[in-house]
Structures are given as structure tokens and as C-alpha cells.
Swiss-Prot record:
Part of the 30S ribosomal subunit. Contacts protein S5. The interaction surface between S4 and S5 is involved in control of translational fidelity. The gene is rpsD. It comes from Shouchella clausii (strain KSM-K16) (Alkalihalobacillus clausii). GO terms for biological process: ribosomal small subunit biogenesis; translation. Belongs to the universal ribosomal protein uS4 family. InterPro entries: Ribosomal_uS4, Ribosomal_uS4_bac-type, Ribosomal_uS4_CS, Ribosomal_uS4_N, S4_RNA-bd, S4_RNA-bd_sf. One of its GO terms (molecular function) is structural constituent of ribosome. One of the primary rRNA binding proteins, it binds directly to 16S rRNA where it nucleates assembly of the body of the 30S subunit. This is Small ribosomal subunit protein uS4.
Amino acid sequence: MSRYTGPSWKLSRRLGVSLSGTGKELAKRPYAPGQHGPNQRKKLSEYALQLHEKQKLRHMYGVNERQFLRTFNDAGKMNGIHGENFMILLESRLDNLVYRMGLARTRRAARQLVNHGHVLVDGSRVDIPSYRVKPGQTIGLRERSRNLTVVKEALDVNDFTPGYVSFDEEKLEGTYTRYPERSELPAEITEALIVEWYSR
């Protein structure tokens, strides 16, 4: 299944969660798009709830179905709780950590920075958004990329860096210091429903 490339605000309203991370999509109209959006009160079946939760998390991180399933299977090989490990692996993606460090305003913008070769991991260029960063690795920008307008604009509005990431504004370089705790990950996701979906 290909990655969704349409308007993020429309998908955010349909899924009921801000995919950009800004919350602006739901500020004025926190309901599904369309004529009947404000009045939709349909009770979802268990199947529909599981599918909805899967789609919500998949689109939140901007991952296609094949990558999503591969990451889910990798999480199942780890010690601990499958659902939590799954979310930790998604959070460890390079594009996501570029976003978390404030170098991009959205995950989609972060993915473009990585794709276009602007991002370094431990001093070496990495252009694979799904690259899995390990705790202790550093993430920065190439010298010529530090003056990009999109980066400057992102840094101007960023006012929060999660506890599992450190960031040096002078060097425009950050470190993935540790894996996140579940309490530090998106609270609007019920990962147990996703585990149930793939366990059918």
C-alpha cells in the first residue's frame, strides 16, 4: 500500500488526531470532513476500532503498510510488551527524531530533509527516513543545509524537546539518549488494538 500524499488536515479530521503534530487541523472542526461530519455518532465494531487505530498510528508516522508490518514483526522479536516495543521502534525512525529535535515542523517535512540528503547520523549522510537510530547516536545537518529556510522556521517555533532526546542549538545537533518510556509516547494511541488486529 502506498503512502498517503493528500491533504493532511483532511486525514487528521477523519482519524480524529493531529497528524502534523500542531493540532491546527482539529482546532476549528474536530470532526470528520464532509456534510455529515459533525453528526456522525456511529458505534464502531471491534474490527473497525482495530483498523481505525492501526491507520491512525500508521499515518501519524507516515509509514506505508509494508514498513509498518515489518516494524511490527521486528517488535515481536524483542523482550517486553509487543505494542510498546512497536511504538518505540516507530519513534526511533530517523525522520521522526529529526522532527522531535525541532529541525522540521512536521514528520512529513522531516522525511523530505532526510530524503534530500540534508541529514547526518554520527557524521555520515543518511538518506533513508526509516533508518532505525540507536540510543547514543547523534543526528545533525550537513554544513550547507543549516541555513535552509524550512529548518530556521522550524527552530523558531519549536518549544519542546522530549526527555529521550538532547539538542544543541549552537551545533544544530542532537543525540537520541535513550529509548522512550510509554508515558512519553502518543497518549491518543491504544496499541493493544493494533496487536489484536495483526493477531486475527
